[in-house]
A protein has these predicted regions:
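Charged phosphate-binding loop/patch that engages nucleotide di/tri-phosphates or the phosphate backbone
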Residues: 220-236
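Acidic-basic catalytic patches of nuclease active cores, encompassing PD-(D/E)XK
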Residues: 89-113
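Generic detection of long, well-ordered alpha-helical segments
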Residues: 63, 90-98, 167, 211-214, ...
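Charged, glycine-rich intrinsically disordered N-terminal tails and low-complexity linkers that flank
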Residues: 1-95, 157-164, 236
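Short, contiguous clusters of charged residues that form electrostatic/catalytic patches at enzyme active sites
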Residues: 71, 99-102, 172
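Nucleic-acid nuclease catalytic cores
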Residues: 106-132, 136-225
Length: 236
């Protein structure tokens, strides 16, 4: 008598789907860890705004910038993955980011690659880099899926000057991304599928590369790198 457990086809399909789901999650976790390690100790686009305050004295690093440098020093000299923070709002953005890109592609007829889990970290020298939400021919994309009230505000962004006024953090993020990725323009995309009318859900604006601000970024970044290396020498 064969005592082996006999599974029905439906049950086998369920088990296979569970195994595939677990494998996909494992691969996603591994990719995320690799991404964190690539960024470790580097100044990144998402936080580069921390170097871009107190610009009336461009040749000096303000206190907040020095704090950022110290964090990068600690990451460089310690083992393991850098600390990461996630909130409900951030998870919402992550969950809807790919859909936002798809809606953008439908609207503009532009093709965007390196999205979602296929995003790539682009190094800028040894100490910096960026991870675009998407890349296309001659452009990049930064996608936000904010609170509905914030989406209303973002509808007022039509160009780089508007973005700099409404959210300077994102402005500097995009300018630095253009520097890293060698692009001349970047799309700022805001998407909120909770709006009743579909035409209200997607908003985007072209942000042009600003060479004057790029030079400011390069200046502050070099100051930050110099400070980082100076502090690391204390541990030699």
């Amino acid at each position: 008598m064969n005592s082996a457990l006999q599974l029905q086809p439906v049950e086998m399909n369920v088990i296979q789907s569970l195994d595939l789901g677990a494998l996909n999650n494992l691969q996603a976790d591994k990719s995320h860890e690799e991404w964190l390690l690539q960024r470790k100790g580097k100044f990144t686009a998402s936080e580069i705004h921390r170097l871009m305050t107190a610009l009336s004295k461009p040749n000096e690093l303000p206190v907040g910038a020095i704090t950022y440098v110290i964090e990068k020093v600690a990451e460089t000299l310690t083992d393991g993955l850098p600390e990461s923070f996630s909130s409900e709002a951030m998870q919402w953005g992550k969950d809807n980011e790919v859909e936002a890109i798809e809606k953008f592609e439908e609207k503009t007829r532009l093709f965007v690659n390196n999205t979602g889990e296929n995003q790539k970290f682009i190094k800028y020298g040894k100490h910096a880099g960026c991870t675009p939400d998407g890349l296309g021919y001659g452009f990049g994309a930064e996608t936000k899926c904010p609170k509905s009230s914030t989406h209303v505000i973002y509808k007022g962004i039509l160009n780089g000057q508007d973005l700099k006024k409404i959210n300077s953090d994102y402005y500097w993020q995009i300018q630095f991304s253009m520097l890293c990725a060698k692009k001349s323009k970047w799309f700022f995309i805001s998407y909120d599928k909770r709006f009743s009318k579909e035409k209200h859900r997607l908003h985007y604006a072209v942000i042009e590369r600003n060479e004057n601000d790029i030079e400011l970024l390069k200046l502050r970044l070099q100051l930050a790198i110099d400070k980082k290396l100076e502090l690391i020498k204390n541990f030699k």
